[in-house]
Amino acid sequence: MSLLTEVETPTRNGWECKCDDSSDPLVIAASIIGILHLILWILDRLSFKCIYRRLKYGLKRGPSTEGVPESMREEYQQEQQNAVDVDDGHFVNIELE
């Protein structure tokens, strides 16, 4: 038994492909899985920035503030905002002549 499922044979009209085992359930299942894999890979590449950045940065909410007095919550939020503001200063603008 040959491992090849497709054989190209010359005919009067040109080359054509004769698939003997194309109705085999295993071949059909492999084709469907291959097509689904390709579709999912394309969708993953197209939505990479949206999904993974949201998972990486969107789910980080910080520690719970339950049971903490309101004044301490405001102080914590101010510290977090100051830390974000300081991070903006790390970027350097380079001007090319």
UniProtKB/Swiss-Prot annotation:
Main subcellular location: virion
GO CC annotation, single: host cell plasma membrane
Covalently lipidated residues, kind S-palmitoyl cysteine: 50
Key words of the record: Disulfide bond, Host cell membrane, Host membrane, Host-virus interaction, Hydrogen ion transport, Inhibition of host autophagy by virus, Ion channel, Ion transport, Lipoprotein, Membrane, Palmitate, Phosphoprotein, Signal-anchor, Transmembrane, Transmembrane helix, Transport, Viral ion channel, Virion
Topological type in the membrane: Single-pass type III membrane protein
Chain intervals for the UniProt region annotation (Disordered): 60-81
Regulation: The M2 protein from most influenza A strains is inhibited by amantadine and rimantadine, resulting in viral uncoating incapacity. Emergence of amantadine-resistant variants is usually rapid.
Intravirion side: 44-97
Site (Seems to be involved in pH gating): 41
Membrane-spanning intervals of the chain: 23-43
Marked site positions, Essential for channel activity, possibly by being protonated during channel activation, and by forming the channel gate and the selective filter: 37
GO molecular function: monoatomic ion channel activity; proton transmembrane transporter activity
GO biological process assignments: protein complex oligomerization; symbiont genome entry into host cell via pore formation in plasma membrane; symbiont-mediated suppression of host autophagy
Compartment(s) of residence: Virion membrane; Host apical cell membrane
Stretches assigned to coiled coil: none
Keyword Lipoprotein listed: yes
Lipoprotein as UniProt keyword: yes
Positions where Phosphoserine occurs in the chain: 64
Virion surface side: 1-22
Family: Belongs to the influenza viruses matrix protein M2 family.
Miscellaneous: When the channel is activated, one or more imidazole moieties of His-37 probably become bi-protonated.
Quaternary structure and partners: Homotetramer; composed of two disulfide-linked dimers held together by non-covalent interactions. May interact with matrix protein 1.
Domain notes: Cytoplasmic tail plays an important role in virion assembly and morphogenesis.
Protein purpose: Forms a proton-selective ion channel that is necessary for the efficient release of the viral genome during virus entry. After attaching to the cell surface, the virion enters the cell by endocytosis. Acidification of the endosome triggers M2 ion channel activity.
Protein name in UniProt: Matrix protein 2
Gene name as annotated: M
